Structure formats: C-alpha cells, structure tokens
UniProtKB/Swiss-Prot annotation:
Coiled coil: none
EngA-type G domain segment(s): 5-170, 186-359
List of residues binding GTP 1: 11-18, 58-62, 122-125
Name of the protein this chain belongs to: GTPase Der
Organism: Bordetella pertussis (strain Tohama I / ATCC BAA-589 / NCTC 13251)
Keywords: GTP-binding, Nucleotide-binding, Repeat, Ribosome biogenesis
Binding site for GTP 2: 192-199, 239-243, 304-307
PROSITE patterns documented for this protein: G_ENGA
Amino acid sequence: MSFKPVVALVGRPNVGKSTLFNRLTRSRAALVADFSGLTRDRHYGEGRVGDTPFLVIDTGGFEPVAKDGILAEMARQTRQAIAEADVVVFLVDARAGVNAHDHEIARLLRKSGQQRVLLAVNKAEGMGVGNATGDFHELGLGEPHPISAAHGDGIVDLIEIALSGLVAPPADTGEQLEQDVVDHRIKLAIVGRPNVGKSTLINTLLGEERVIAFDMPGTTRDAIEIDFERDGRKYTLIDTAGLRKRGKVFEAIEKFSVIKTLQAIEASNVVLLMIDAQAEVSEQDAHIAGFVLETGRAVVVAINKWDGLDSDQRERIEREFQRKLRFLGFARMHTISALKGQGVKPLLKSVNAAHAAAFAKLSTPRLTRELQAAVEQQPPPRKGIFRPKMRYAHQGGQNPPLIVIHGNALDAVPDSYRRYLETRFRNAFDLAGTPLRIEFKSSRNPYVQEN
C-alpha cells in the first residue's frame, strides 16, 4: 500500500504556520465547515498541488527544549513527525528576523536525520528577496524561500519543490475499492492517542488466530496490514499501534505516531476511534476526529476502560464527549473494556453497520420522495424575495454517501436546513456511522443580474 506524501510544518509560535496550513488545505476545509462543533484549530489536513495529493501536519508552536508535561509530550511528537515526514517545511518570520528559538529548531532539524528540509521565510510580501532572506542563511539549511502565507505568494513553487522526486500514490481507479465491497472486506483503522488501549483491543480482536500479514518496511508511506475473520466477515486491520510478530502470531505494542495514524485513516474505510474513559477528551482526540470527518471515513467510537468508572465519572465523560466531539453525533458510541473483552463483540457489529452505510446505494426515486416529504414538512427559509426550490435528488458518490439536490436558488440554503435534510436522509436510509455530504446544484443563480 502506498500513501500520500507527508509535509510537516515546523516553526516557533506566531510565524504563520496556521495561515500556511489553512491555505494548503483550504479546498478540503470547506467540506466540513458546516459541522457544528468541529474544531477550527485543525492540525491535520489534505492538500493538492496539480494532480499530486499530500497530507499536511501543523506541528503547533514547537518548544524543543520543553522538559515537563504537555509541552514535553508535544515536543516529543513533533520530533517524531519530523523524523517520519517525507519533507519538513521550517517556517520563519521575515519581519522578526532570526532569533535563538529559530537556531534551536534548526539545530534539531540538522540532528534529526531528515534529509528534506525547506526553509520558508514567511511574511516576505513587500520586501525584496535579499532583505527578506538574507539573515536566514546563517541557519545552515540551504537556500531560504520567501513566501507570504497570507497572500499566497510563492506557495505553489514551495510545495512543488517540496514534493519533487517523491513518489505519489497511483491514481485510485476504484477497482480495489469495488473488489473490497464485493468481498465484503472491511479495512479497519483503530486510532487514538497514546495509552488509550489500542494495543490491548487489537490483541483481543486477533486473539491467538494465525493471520496473513503484508509487511512492507521502508518509507513511512508503507503500512502493515493484518487480515482476520470474525463470524464469517473479513477484515483488514491497518496498523497504527505498532505490531510485532511473535512466531506466526502478531502482538500489538503501544506506540503513537501522528503520521501513521493519519495514513491509516486514509487507507481505511472504517475508523474505530478510541477514547480513554479515565482521562479527559483531549485536543488530540478532537484533531484526530476532525481528520476522520474531513476524509469522509465511517467511524465508530469506543470509550475504553469504562469498567473502572463509577456512575458520576461515567456521566462526566458522556457530557464531555457530547460537548467536545458533538460533530461525531452520527457515530455509534460504545463503552468497552478492551482488557476484559467486555463490549468488543457489539463493537464489530457497529463497524459492519457503519461500513454498510458508507457504501449504501440510494435510489433516485426514493431520495426524491424523501426530499419532497422533508420540504413539505419544513420548507427552506426565504432569502430576500427568493425561496429555494428543490426539485429532485440523486446519489453522487459513496464512502461517504453524497446526495446531490437539484433546484433553483439553492445557494441561499442555510447550514441549519442542510443539517435538517441530513437528519431526514439518515433516518430514512439508516445511515448511522458514516458522514453524509449534501451538494446543492442550482439550474440558475437568481442573484446574478444579466446585462
């Protein structure tokens, strides 16, 4: 299996990493903008230059010398992302100039063994190339590239240089996807932050079963896949926890890699997101969940270590989940103990149901009838003198299901009405566990005046 190249954005706080990240991933962000509660502080996303897709990681404000607590854990994960990324873009600030923090990060990059590092000098708009980049040669990371993340100057050239020579994954013809559907094979990624219990759950699922593995070590774009069967259903487990072989049996060891997590999500068609019941729902949980939603993967949520909580603690974690991850309201949620095997069997039933929903075939007549019933019960609101008129609906894609609605003045449909329609379609077609996307196509735009 070949993965998309990974670009890691590194730099001290306030140099423009988030602005660059948003510009690189803006075409994807629009797909999830209407999901209530989805964090806008995204750290992982998909980008594309020409025909080349890639993944982007914003490593956040990097404090390489942090020794304790959450900053130290973030620094450790950033160092791992630097080592595993295909290319690192080190962002500095043209207007602030070089400082000691930049030198510290440059030193770390040189020691990391990462062969592909591009030095991007941001906020260079209105400055001559020499003025913008001159001081940054002293960082010893090659020729600086002046850019403006805010204005878009130099971004395409920067990413084309970053990706040059990297082997992009072959275009998806859909043949393998169709074969997986015919075989009823589910590609399952079990994801979650460190020590959430991924390894325990994987070992519980695999048991002592002898499995077929496709082990392709090499670059970070290679994956380990494990095939197994349960109750006559075929699954392919895509490794994120770190699987090691003992004889003919695989054992999972707890390990966390942001990049391997994102790549496994990309390669899967169902994601099992694990949350630790004995810890707060973290920003990292929300970032991973947001990326799952962005990629359109079906998802099941497993809250692990549930057996160790009293009733008050259980209520607290449920409230916290609803508050921080309410954009995953379509997903089935399970409480489990991976260690004791409690609740694991129903988990796979929900995985199967989410997969079926993601690949559901929705007939045009039935979609249109449901659309008309929804509009009759609650018409879309007017915008000015125009009321959106919805004529018919058809399916535009699977995994996730895409419903295309045709009519007039549909540019005026608010997000609240889109969510109303989504709920109607979900209930009518039993689409639990999968994102559902709705696209409006107007036959004409009444807001454009003809000359």
